[in-house]
Amino acid sequence: MELETHLSKYFTLAFTHKSMGLEMREKLAINSSATLKEFLQTIKNHCPNIKECMVLSTCNRFEIYASLKHGAHANEQKSALLKILAQNKKMSVSDLEKCVLMSVDESAVHHVFSVCSSLDSLVVGETQITGQMKNAYKFAFEEKFCSKDLTRLLHFAFKCAAKVRNLTGISKQGVSISSVAVKEALNIFEKERIKDKKALVIGLGEMAQLVIKHLLNKQFEALILGRNEAKFEDFIKELEEPKKVSFQNIENLNAYINEYQLLFCATSSPHFIVQNDMLKETIFRRFWFDLAVPRNIEKPVLDNIFLYSVDDLEPMVRENVENRQESRTKAYEIVGLATMEFYQWIQSLEVEPLIKDLRELARISAQKELQKALKKRYVPKEYESNIEKILHNAFNTFLHHPTIALKKNAQKEESDVLVGAIKNLFNLDKSSANHAQNLNLYKCEYYEE
């Protein structure tokens, strides 16, 4: 597809589990709002050709999504961003260069849609990534780092992800990093013939909550160590068996760390939470799953502790990928079609074509009525040319203020809805109007029909 110059230039930089090891992903990870805001502000200050920007940082990827100003060169923006990353994260540009994937225009849109649809995830079909992208978009939008361009892109990405889930069934098995970890833990317990199905879970964020739900489904009991007991009380209201879950403040970690054979750790802490100086010898073997990036557990010095990181779970994930190959093929077809539909939709929402259509509609309507008047001899034929000029001036005058208002509002976030409403009102393009009506700019999602 040949893109017209007035359309937004989309741009992505991606570092993922496919191109970068856990140790380097730890360095890139951003786990606090303050750090994320500071990083986005640095980009805004040093990259004047980047119009809008957002960052997606998860355990398996660090990605920058942006729209570029007209005439900006993607390779120059890539170099500038890698330099910022290198300085910010104390890494070398050459190391980053080896691991980064840059995508521009259609490729960038296709990449964002694929990520949001969980086709690029370590565990294909997991649904957590869509929520993570919504949170990343919402933060950038509320902090005014992104506006119309990325709003359009992300809304369509969420719509695409929903379509992939609904039409392929790729997420029906509910597989995620957390479920793979719990499944592996269950396998270990069966091999080790461990009958006491109890687990210690450190953290109460989204990943930790998923772990707890999977543990309960496998008939485990869980002790949660966290900082916010009120959050725990709200969480257990969602559970079918809340009595199997208990809570202690994380300050009591030393009292429990050597009591459990099974441990899951998933917090947003940038430092080790479980450290070697906390450990004591035990007569039983221990199995620990560190699902955080950066890692939360220091590499154990004791021989009877077996530690699994996110990357260690990859071999267990491959079977999941192979089993879902047919669904993936269909999903990629949906993503490819969505990419084309996105650009068609964007073009339909441009203000200039709408103004042209309104003027043409006015001209056709005026000409139609003039021909009726001539046919019924309400006006002499020799006046036709002069009447055409009068009508032309009349509808130009009538459309003057709406034209100025449309151009003025063209760069605002709500312009898509405005253009769609006008198209619907004048019956110019019902398909694009329906898209705009379903768009909810503030919840960053589409309403289901």
From Swiss-Prot:
Gene Ontology MF: a single term: NADP binding
Enzyme's top EC category: oxidoreductase
EC number from the UniProt entry: 1.2.1.70
InterPro entries for the chain: 4pyrrol_synth_GluRdtase (IPR000343), 4pyrrol_synth_GluRdtase_dimer (IPR015896), 4pyrrol_synth_GluRdtase_N (IPR015895), GluRdtase_CS (IPR018214), GluRdtase_dimer_dom_sf (IPR036453), GluRdtase_N_sf (IPR036343), NAD(P)-bd_dom_sf (IPR036291), Shikm_DH/Glu-tRNA_Rdtase (IPR006151)
Keyword field: NADP, Oxidoreductase, Porphyrin biosynthesis
Gene3D superfamilies xref list: Glutamyl-tRNA reductase, N-terminal domain, NAD(P)-binding Rossmann-like Domain
Record: residues binding NADP(+): 203-208
Pfam families named in the record: GlutR_dimer, GlutR_N, Shikimate_DH
Active site (UniProt): 59
Site feature Important for activity, where: 111
CDD domains recorded: NAD_bind_Glutamyl_tRNA_reduct
Annotated SUPFAM superfamilies: Glutamyl tRNA-reductase catalytic, N-terminal domain (SSF69742), Glutamyl tRNA-reductase dimerization domain (SSF69075), NAD(P)-binding Rossmann-fold domains (SSF51735)
Pathway note: Porphyrin-containing compound metabolism; protoporphyrin-IX biosynthesis; 5-aminolevulinate from L-glutamyl-tRNA(Glu): step 1/2
Gene Ontology biological process terms, A to Z: protoporphyrinogen IX biosynthetic process
Comment block on domains: Possesses an unusual extended V-shaped dimeric structure with each monomer consisting of three distinct domains arranged along a curved 'spinal' alpha-helix. The N-terminal catalytic domain specifically recognizes the glutamate moiety of the substrate. The second domain is the NADPH-binding domain, and the third C-terminal domain is responsible for dimerization.
NCBIfam families for the chain: hemA
HAMAP family in the cross-refs: Glu_tRNA_reductase
Function: Catalyzes the NADPH-dependent reduction of glutamyl-tRNA(Glu) to glutamate 1-semialdehyde (GSA).
Oligomeric form and interacting partners: Homodimer.
Family of this protein: Belongs to the glutamyl-tRNA reductase family.
Protein name per UniProt: Glutamyl-tRNA reductase
